[in-house]
């Protein structure tokens, strides 16, 4: 009973709180807080009251008034501090700011925000702040140090007050600006200021005396303090001349701790005479600045090693400082080791908890605080700003997880996870929203598309919280559908139909869904379509390289749906091109000129598009003869947790050619990744290979190809289990990093965004640095998202050189920095054009050009662009006046280049050339155009060559070459047998056919024999490239069944029948035509036999004007010439003679459009319209006048427009008559073509003609009237 009451209570409460449980009051959320600690020296200065040194934003949102509280080192900052101390302020948006700071103000700062009405609160992470400060020396008393010449001197910088971010120097007592010089013999410890001189010389004593002693000076934040002065007292003794290196006490201990992401300095000092050379090594390998975040500043003579950003994976190891000089003994240099232990401030191991978590009422959920840190962090959970100290029946704290059980509305709120160790703290904030929603189908239900004889799935997915506990399905008759008898109702409510039947399953379905808050029912219609089926799939093939394969795929689908096809090779979609084509009308995928890379598994996918999606697949294996079979049984030795594994395999058949090597390919789960070769195993007997430094944070699969002299095998099946790697730092910077100058004063820095598999971890972004070269400015740093590929440099200036650098960073750490790249910003294009362009040596495929170089004072000339275009000299008639869009271009670099040979031209072609100077701003003005005709050359192979193979004949047909390279003068064709495996070595004797021939029958061949067919075309330069093809003649047999004949009416009582032979049998010697009227009971009549060698068609006359049926029969000398066997008759073609009056006086029907009366009627109508139009034009314009000024303006505008059109569109001319008359024809001059060199006076005399009435009617007529030359010439075309 109490369970029912509880359910009723919850139901009532849920109704009051609205189905979505959208809160009326938004809880407070911090929206702006610093992501980085303020710990860099000089970032926060002490005692500076001019500016606000500490500014910590803590903006937050919420429905009610908010209250901000800040804590410093876990103690609340008293609000009175903001009232009485003018150097501390708490702004209305929660920002804390301060100035005039002291060293005591360093530490952690944390922001708390509270809703003043609901008392719900939230908080930020603890932000670490270091105050750059200088402590004064405790004593300023001078002091003296006694030392012998040749012995080392070590002097401590005297005690002083607390300091941070300071630098040390030893300066003159007379003037602080005069420093005691640092050298390879003199060092100052950067962390303590202690002075170390390897050995004292007379020069040192003299320097001390000149400076009147030296003082330890400490400085930071524009503050300086100096200690008392040090003077030297020299003790008499014998000077030590030479010594080998030995290490003094160091401020760095043998075991050092560092924090990931922060700076770490290691310092070593050695004494020797002469001064030693210091080298830093990591695990025995010498370190260099700029690699793996290592910097060895030259100012410290190699004593200081700085790691600018510590990485656990790179730097948790042993570093060695080695010292050596010419006194180093045979045992090697002196060494000092530093073992670096890297600790880590808390960070999210994968990602922080979501900012919003929706949990259906009465359901379970969880929040995970997945953190990585060293040492282990303390994890705490908070609700509405209050720590959850113990679990309840509804919310349980389980280490880094927070578990919600049987959730009620009371569990809604702000939940925060904090993870803290000695190095830092991170905080998450999640609003947990409890949903209570009765089932609703407002987002729709159906329609459903099912396919005959396939599995059908009908989803029932209402909006509901909790998920419905009850689902019921009903058919259109209202009968409930239960699991069984071909139905299954899955847990999520989906109705599964095992095998769809149209008669049973087309119609309406209803789904009923219920939870304890309510129920809902929806009705949808199911339509059943015929499923997609492949009726003829591709077959497995083994073919030779260089041949062609045809893969057929025919499918059927529902007639109301559109059927599509796509092809895949090894699961990658095939891109169609000139070599790989899908012949849609034939349902054939054809691949020409096969290469070994084309081997693979080809899959045809036939489908109907979404939402009515149905697909069918069929696959075939295509092996390229000679290449090995792929390896099998691929195995991985481990799951790749450390980014290393070993791949093993079983070698496949080599196909009679020894395997040379193996190619290992890799692919990840990311959508932008593809199969990529990552290893070349050169040992042909290998059966395993180690894979190291794999891509991080990825699920990887591998496959392998074996390679022999014929090429690579098909790829193996990929590894069955994924290789899942841990996260790592990026190992590269973005590819194609460069500068791209744009218009004047523009510069874009561009790169190729890194593919997801190259990230090595989540959260990738780029750091970009840039500055103007030789400006003295610091590098400007910007941050760019992983998907970005460019950055526009602000205020780039006119033709200024910039330098820039990029780095990829992810949540694990920083990748390597790119080298500095330099580029000039944008400039204007050159203003001059190349002059005196001349043509030099000409060959069939090249033209030499020369010109005078261009100078440009406001930037650079990077080179020249040569534009060229042409057309065959056979058809060339006109010259272009502007560069057409299809022109080719060649870039010639170098401003001083004045001669260049353009290659790759087509023979026997008229080319035009235009040259421009260019730079990053674009092209300069165009040069004058020059022309050249290339010489003839040998032609390419004939085109559209078809080879029809029979038993004793081969028929070859062709068309002229697509690359004639001149005037074709002849063809030749021939054939020759071959028995070896290399038919290219066979010499073919060919017979000339003459230039007009388009077919050649090769006779007297041997059945079932391999032949090489070869043919060539010729120009005056000789025979061109051969077309060669290997074929095998068929067995001796009668002709195959002919194709349907082509029949055309040639007269009112006759037709021409064209014979079309069939393939697969012997060649046709003779053929006859069988014909009859298409009347029931009519018998076929036969023509006499026609010699197929002499003619391929026949005229049949004396026919009636009725429909006839025609078919053909063929024969040859099989099995004997005396008793030949006829072929089967072809299929029937129906046709009739040409309509008209027959010669026997019978009238047949004539189409209306060919009737004489209809043609006469059209002519009469046209004449009437012409007379009417002439009358209208005459009456409108008679006696009209207009002003001379307007007429002249119109004429000038027309001339300008015409000139503009010529310049943009281009026009052609030659020495003959122009294709179109000029816009203002001269009445007293001969026609002439357009000429760009004409003088402006050439247009004089082309004005309007003088009429008999003594006035210039055209010139001064009605201003509405267009002059004759402005009329559209097409206006009368209809009546001509």
Swiss-Prot record:
Its keywords, alphabetically, are: Disulfide bond, Membrane, Repeat, Signal, Transmembrane, Transmembrane helix
Q: Provide the protein's localization.
A: Membrane
Coarse class of the protein's main subcellular location: membrane
Topology: which residues are Cytoplasmic? 1178-1280
Any matching Pfam family: Ig_3
Point to the regions of Polar residues compositional bias: 1118-1130
Gene3D superfamilies attached to this UniProt entry:
Immunoglobulins
- Renumbered to this chain, the signal peptide range is 1-19
Topological relation to the membrane, as annotated? Single-pass membrane protein
Q: Hey, which stretches end up on the Extracellular side?
A: 20-1156
Q: Domain of life, per the record?
A: Eukaryota
Which GO BP terms sit in this record?
cell-cell adhesion
**Compositional bias (Basic and acidic residues):** 1262-1273
**Domain Fibronectin type-III spans what residues?**
628-722, 730-824, 830-933, 939-1033, 1039-1131
Q: Where is this region: Disordered?
A: 1118-1144, 1206-1280
| Transmembrane regions | 1157-1177
Q: What is this protein called?
A: Fibronectin type III domain-containing protein
Identify the species of origin.
Acropora millepora (Staghorn coral)
